[in-house]
Amino acid sequence: MTSAYDKLHSTLDVKAFGRVAVLYGGKSAEREVSLKSGAAVIEALTSAGVDVVAIDVGDDLLARLQNEKIDRAFIILHGRGGEDGSMQGLLECLGIPYTGSGILASALAMDKLRTKQVWQSLGIPTPRHAVLASEQDCVAASAELGFPLIVKPAHEGSSIGMAKVNSEQELVAAWKDAAKYDSQVLVEQWIHGPEFTIAVLRGQVLPPIALGTPHVFYDYDAKYIANDTQYRIPCGLDSVKEQELIDLTARACDAIGIEGWGRLDVMQDEQGRFWLLEVNTAPGMTDHSLVPMAARAAGLDFQQLVLAILADSVATRG
């Protein structure tokens, strides 16, 4: 029996990938998550027979890429230096094909403000927001947006530096904390309602996942540590709303230029409307991660998932 997801599978012989550098670790605030993701990807590719070179990205990266005679790179770096277009630019200069989105889409997706501006320009729903650079900005945002609000560093992932606030005093404190991670800080309207995450792979939207957590929101602990986070596949939406969510995901990813794979985070408000939060171009691949869960629901085990991501780099970049 055929499935709508059958075309996601890699049909390539592993020799077609050549010598593959798995780029992980790095120096961003998400290093620990990337180390776990990288270890899982390395194990899966190695067991599939791929010629893998594991590279914990540091100051010797350029020399290692050249000395190891790398044919292709699997980017599983999270955050700055790996997910923001800079690594993609380096690999383009070296002529090394790589997984995932290109330079522009990676840079856009890593910048929450620019992502929102692109979506807004196309009429794609995303929560109202303001940029915080001073206590005066906090006062103005409080008056304009009301409470509750959520504060976010504009260029961090894994919910690092994020906080929900219910007063102007809390907003000022959260802005100061977020500013330790990023010179640009966003504050958004808090959306009351369920949260969904939707993975995309090789141009296809995978089954949406509904998230539930006893935490205030789906924070770092809920994502990577806690065992009380709830994941629901099927997501519980009726067929019409689920298709609306899938179509919105495809449109939002196309607007940013997402390639290969990624993951979109979405809220649904009390009126049933969807609001896009952000998109990740190199999502987590740990034992708590969401893309592997969505892939399983689409009929791909973890090894098949990483081979599909790698195969897409052959299709798009040779």
Swiss-Prot record:
Which annotated residues bind Mg(2+) 2? 278, 280
Q: Which cofactor does it need?
A: Mg(2+); Mn(2+)
Keywords from UniProt, A to Z, are:
ATP-binding, Cell shape, Cell wall biogenesis/degradation, Cytoplasm, Ligase, Magnesium, Manganese, Metal-binding, Nucleotide-binding, Peptidoglycan synthesis
Biological process annotations from GO: cell wall organization; peptidoglycan biosynthetic process; regulation of cell shape
Name the InterPro entries for this protein.
ATP-grasp, ATP_grasp_subdomain_1, D-Ala_lig_Van_CS, D_ala_D_ala, Dala_Dala_lig_C, Dala_Dala_lig_N, PreATP-grasp_dom_sf
Query: What EC class is this?
Result: ligase
Against Gene3D superfamilies, the record matches this protein to: 3.40.50.20, ATP-grasp fold, A domain, ATP-grasp fold, B domain
Which intervals hold domain ATP-grasp?
A: 116-311
Q: Name the Enzyme Commission number(s) assigned to this protein.
A: 6.3.2.4
Question: Which sites bind ATP?
Answer: 142-197
Q: Which Pfam families match?
A: Dala_Dala_lig_C, Dala_Dala_lig_N
UniProt lists the family membership as follows: Belongs to the D-alanine--D-alanine ligase family.
What protein does this entry describe?
D-alanine--D-alanine ligase
Organism of origin: Pseudomonas entomophila (strain L48)
